Amino acid sequence: MPRVRVVENNSVRVRCIGIYCIKIQFYECLHMSPPAHLLSRTGVHLDVWQADALAGAPGRVVATGDALLDAQLPGGGWPLGALSEIMQPPGVHSEWRLLLPALARCGTGAVVLVGAPHLPFGPALGAQGLMPHRLLWVAAQGGAQSGAQRLWATEQALRCADVDAVLAWLGSVRPEQLRRLQMAAAEYAKLLFVLRPEQAQNESSPAALRLWAAPSGDASDTLEVRALKRRGPPMDQPLHLTARPARLVCLLAANHTWSGDALDRTAAHA
C-alpha cells in the first residue's frame, strides 16, 4: 500500500499518494470575508443579484438610442447574444421605432428579417442610419410548415458570420424552440429579436428580455412600452417614448418653422 504523506499550513493541504498529489485549497476560517474589491458599496458581493435592483447585463449590450429605455434595461441596452421578445397588439408594427437606432449602430453586417409582414422601405431606413444594402428579407410563405421554416431560417441566419442581427416574426412557438434560438444567439454573439402577438405574453419563454409595445391611447406620437420580463424589479409605470425618430422630429419642426415664416412673409406683402 502506498505511503500517504500530508503537509499542512494555514491555507493549503497537500496529500501525496505515491506519485499523485491532490492539492486542496481552503479558507483558514469559514467566516472569512471576501476581498474588498469584490464587494459593492452596500457590502454585497458583486456576483449576488438583488431582486429589487436592476441587474447588469451578463454580456455586452447595444444601446437602444433612447435614454429612457436604456435606463430600464439591464446593462443599459439590448443584450448581445441573447433573445429579446417584443409583443404587440394586432395590426401594430412599432418594432422599427424601438430597434432601428441599435440596428444602425450594431455593425456593418447584414440585418436579416425573417417573415417580416411588410417589405421595408429602404430609403426611410437609410435616412435613419440603416443602409439598405445591409437588409436581407426572408419571405415566409403561409401554410402548416411556415412556422418551422421561419425557425429554421432564423437559426441559420444566427449561425452566419456575416450577420449582425436577426429579426424574426413568429406566431405560435414552443419554449424549447425559442431556447434553441437563444442558444444559437449566445453561441454566435448576435442580436436576436423575436416579434410576437401580444397573447404570447402569457406563455413561458426563455427570453432574457420581454417587452410589450403599442401606440399610447391618448397620443399617436407616443409609444407605450412595458417590461414583461427583465432581470430586475417590475416596472412601476410604463414608459412613454416619442414614436417618431429624433431626426424626423427635428425635420418636421424645421419644416413647420419654415412654413410659418413663409406665411408671415406672404401676409406682409399682401
Describe the predicted segments one by one.
Residues 123-125, 155, 178-180, 204-206, ...:
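Short, well-ordered secondary-structure micro-motifs
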